[in-house]
Amino acid sequence: MIWLRNRRCLEPLQGTPKWVPVLGELQKTLQKGEYLPLRPLPMFESNFVQVTHQGGPVFVNHRTNRLAMGVAASLPGLVLPDILLIGQPAEDRDCSGLVLTRMIPLDLVHLCVHDLSAWRLKLRLVSGRQYYLALDAPDNEVGFLFHCWVRLINLLQEPAPTWTPRTTRTAPLDMPLAEAPASTWHLQDQPISRHAVRVAERNFPHKTVAAQRQRKAKALKRSFKSQAVGDSVPLIWSQLEHADVRKKPAEKKSHSDPRPDRTHTQIRLPEKTSITTWTIFSIISSTANQTQSSPKACTSASDEATGQGHVVESPSHCVSADSPDGFFLGSCSSLDPCLWHQDTEDLMDSGGSTLSSAASGLAPYPPAACLSTPYSSIPRGREKAGPMGSHQGPGPPPCQKAPSGLVTSCKAPFLVDQSQKLPAVPASSWKPPPGLAPPQKAPAASAPPRKAPAVPAPSQKAPAVPAPSQKAPAIPAPSRKASAASASPRKASAVPAPPQKTPPPSQKAPSVPTIPQKAVSPTAPKKKSLLLPAPSQKALPTSPTEYQMALSPPASRGKLPGDFDVLPTGIPGRAVLERSQSGGKPEPVVTVRTQETDVVEMTTQAKSPESPFTVTKKESKDILISQTKEVTLEAFRGQGKLEDWAHWAKLEERSPDLPGVRSKELEQRKRWVKAKELAVEGPSQEHSRPFSVEALTLTKLMITANSKEQPSKSALVSLPSWLLATPQASATSMMASVPSRPGQLSLLEGKPVVVREQPESHTWVKEGKRPWGEMKEQPWGEMKEPPWDPKGPPKVPFRSKPTSASLKREGISQAPIPLTASPWEDLRPSPLSETLISKMEATARASQQPKRVSQEPMRMPAQHPLATVGSSSEILLPMLLELETVRNTATKAEEIQEESGVLNLLPSLQHSQHSEWPDAGA
């Protein structure tokens, strides 16, 4: 290890590598003339190799798929890029360069960090396809280039007004560029020279540079033989200064882009120089929380830094590996750790399922003693010490009072790994020993203009470096093995201890803690080289007692002041192993072994996913609500029916939409189907006649009696008792045998016919009686019809009950019963019939009662559909007439018996008539 260190000391004689902005292959391809619409565009590009989500290569045509991906702005004045360009090497071996294969708007692309330790990005298109791209660059350049890509992703995800600089002059967006701007960085070896590369420097309106420094910058520009291509200086500012700039509205001028999310100032016109474009390349190369160097940052040739005797030679920005802090100088506040955590956490691919342990999370605050990850692993002999407050890596910008304790590592990630959960070295609550006086702001013997203690402790009372309350690792554990220079198989690295001249008890600077094996042993089975910070001459105590105090158990963890500052992480290209200039004695070597586990720990903020399940419950009910209403009014019947269908459904479905997320859906459906049916029925045909039932019945009897047709068969028609309950029921109490024929009976069911009855030719006499016995002697014959009286009211003939005294008397005024002729006319009196008639007369004589009969003839009621009796409005319900068919038997005696049976019913009908008449009359 000592031999390797001694060999590296000779390399600075050959030249110091410096970061130089150059044209990338994709930018060169656009300048060949084949893509004329794509004029010189502000672009940032890098070479990538397509891999799988686990890091394995993807083979296309039996070879790895290499490509160049760049982001560019379609207009030179745009602050943010808006298109993504992808080029691939030409398949023809004769053709050199790239072939542009893809040009996709950035609105349709989502770019994120997939794995920090493997330098892998994830490209997801709007169609859903995902591609994993690993950065393809030399080992000494990959860290810085990947850091630029991370900053680009951060800028694309946050609103631009938070970081866009303010300019005094603006130019049109489509102003063509004089030459193609640089699109990438390259670490180039320079000849031995103490001059640094001078590039254009941005002037903020609220910052003025001394006239002497401007003259020096112009002199350096004239003495240069080579000039950087394009605007290669990453201009630097801080978010705290943006607040000051916003307070000066007179100095603000912004240009609105037609796109709503990209409205910023883009181009500035210097007073005496050519057009300097605030390009995408310059924006990406800067960091979010850095500011422009102040006069204290870039000192003159007489100024010294940290008492090392190394001189920052140029006041202008230096783009070199030795001292890139010229444009990475900055200051941080108490808000910077939060901003750093928030910006870096948003870059991670939250949707990726194969995040490694190094990319699973980030510490909310940077560790107490963050080990730097420089981009170059080659230390230099007369190396310039990093100025105080130089920012190293994507961590929070350090305070200007913090020295740079630097460590080298080939491919250690620039972001600190949180998933390893290494216990950081916290600040103990004990007071410093008597020999260690807490310094205020003067740690160095040859004090520079800047006051810088080695590592400020909380409240300036604890010599150890304070650690955050979170489980932030004090040592980054990348997946790739870190090695010093080319000695990768070595398991441990040498860490130079401070020289013997430094008295430990009189140390006036707080100690920089070292990490013992116990602090990192539980996290790695593989032994990898891990480099600890090599502090300056007056920054590290040598006594074992001080080491034990610096590494004391955490007693004050979580009690961090608001103004607490931390050591920054380094950027690749910074030399780390420093040599003591006070003497040439060999430095003792301290060997530290670390272990890290291969266990991949998946840590997520979401809850643990539950086992997926699906439960579905369905319940459905159909209810029929039916309501029927029937109305009957004056022989009109109406029926209404209302039906309602009620459908009640309950659906409960529980299914996992996402891993660990259960969704419960409760759906209730209520459907009402109303079906309304209305049926109105008119009165029956029996009730639709304008005549009363009594009038129609008597009219039917009269028509039947006057009919000339003599049917062969006769039927007995018996009138119901309710028809006899009329004032004239005494006269119509006789039952007559009426022949029943379909043609004649249809009158009751068909259309009503107005029929007038022929009046009788005789007048009624009170209590006129006629014996029933005359019926047997009087032959049946046709009734003579007197002339009709059309104007007179129809009169219904009445018959009185016969008496025994007048059985053989024939009255002239007596009219025969209007019955149709029947075969009874041919019958002769027989002894059997006389006997039956005599019995009938005796029965009639016994039941005979005198009754006064009204002499007024019965008039037909008015023609209206309802039949009313007297003063009562009672509705008469229809009743069917009882039809009895009398068969014509062979013997005449049976017919006589049937006739006598019908006649025997008359006294009972008359008796019921007398009993019902008072009610009907009432």
Curated annotation (Swiss-Prot):
**Which stretches does UniProt call biased (Polar residues)?**
292-305
Q: What InterPro entries does this protein map onto?
A: GARIL-like_Rab2B-bd
One Pfam family, short name = GARIL_Rab2_bd
Q: Which PANTHER family match?
A: GOLGI-ASSOCIATED RAB2 INTERACTOR PROTEIN 5B (PTHR22574:SF12), PTHR22574
Q: What ranges does the record list as Low complexity composition bias?
A: 442-458, 471-495
Annotated region described as Disordered, given as residue ranges: 244-264, 292-317, 373-404, 424-597, 758-830, 842-869
Taxonomy of the source species: Eukaryota, Metazoa, Chordata, Craniata, Vertebrata
- Protein name per its UniProtKB record: Golgi-associated RAB2 interactor protein 5B
Stretches with biased composition (Pro residues)? 431-441, 496-507
Q: Which residues lie in Basic and acidic residues bias regions?
A: 758-788
What's this protein's family per the entry? Belongs to the GARIN family.
Which top-level group of life is the source organism from?
A: Eukaryota
